[in-house]
């Protein structure tokens, strides 16, 4: 039972006492909002079928206790009832309340659909916001803003899937650079990638935490050092790798030394980049990321910087997010592809195109401690072609 806008209005209520009646349920739930109906089920469920009398799946019901479906007139009332009644005791039993599911509401297979990456999202933008923004371009099969699983906050990007390729192409062309909330968004194709094998060096390093990294340098520092790329280091490669984490102000690469500096518009974007990119494989090399040098003028020109004082590493951060993490939709996806592109929780990577060259420069954090060991590239990752942050 869905409204025209697709928002659910029906709740599953389980673990009921056999003394509970439809009248009692309606009396209790109607205190929260007007109820349209209540259907009590007392028969033993078959876990593989749909109850034909109500049209809802009983897959979520695994006991022999009675259960029921309560339908509201308004989605907001159903949502309020879910929050208020789940875990409450009715006639001595703690009831379980959840959204009722129908066969049509089960997760759709969108692997053959056309997926659009949407970046630079404002923190307040929700899944419904991007779905509404892209709806004029055609029928959408899925849309979601990617969230941090620990904090529940938006990671600043999302994905929209279309049934039709032409609709997706038009959305990319016409929505790129448009304002959504307080920011201009970026759009591009999103692509699925095979999982990359772990290297020994990656397996033996430690994963960083955003809360730790963001506090390791002052809020004014927006510069990331990325080193360890012995070959293939280019401005385009760094832009592809780091652009999903926020607006990039400047990039400076030093191919002969195997490192680069990337300056973001915000401290938080830089911290997310360090956490996510550090320890990943780029161009066949496991990279190290940490904060660039703090100076009174964070936009100091590169030509004024003496890089000879930074021939040592200040610290070695640990490993990236685990490769091949199993996701709920059955895909095994690494957080990064061979060329360092991030992967979202649905297994999509980001195909980023190079943008215009950036001007200016910035300093780097003076390393402390021992000089870095010589870079020894891991074995080539054969079989992989060139690669192209509590979703809602």
Swiss-Prot record:
A single GO BP: stem cell proliferation
SUPFAM superfamilies listed in its UniProt record: RNA-binding domain, RBD (SSF54928)
Reported tissue expression: Expressed both in primordial germ cells (PGCs) and in neighboring somatic cells.
Post-translational modification: Phosphorylated by MAPK14 following DNA damage, releasing TIAR from GADD45A mRNA.
Chain ranges of the RRM domain: 9-102, 114-192, 222-294
Keyword hit for RNA-binding: yes
GO molecular function: DNA binding; mRNA 3'-UTR AU-rich region binding
Region spans: Disordered: 363-392
Residues recorded with modification Phosphoserine: 218
Record-level GO cellular component terms: cytolytic granule; cytoplasm; cytoplasmic stress granule; nucleus
Function description: RNA-binding protein involved in alternative pre-RNA splicing and in cytoplasmic stress granules formation. Shows a preference for uridine-rich RNAs. Activates splicing of alternative exons with weak 5' splice sites followed by a U-rich stretch on its own pre-mRNA and on TIA1 mRNA. Promotes the inclusion of TIA1 exon 5 to give rise to the long isoform (isoform a) of TIA1. Acts downstream of the stress-induced phosphorylation of EIF2S1/EIF2A to promote the recruitment of untranslated mRNAs to cytoplasmic stress granules (SG).
Domain notes: The RRM 2 domain is required for the binding to target RNA, and the RRM 1 and RRM 3 domains seem to contribute to the affinity of the interaction with RNA. The RRM2 domain and the C-terminal residues 290-339 contribute to nuclear localization.
Assembly notes: Interacts with FASTK.
Name of the protein described by the UniProt record: Nucleolysin TIAR
Gene from which the chain derives: Tial1
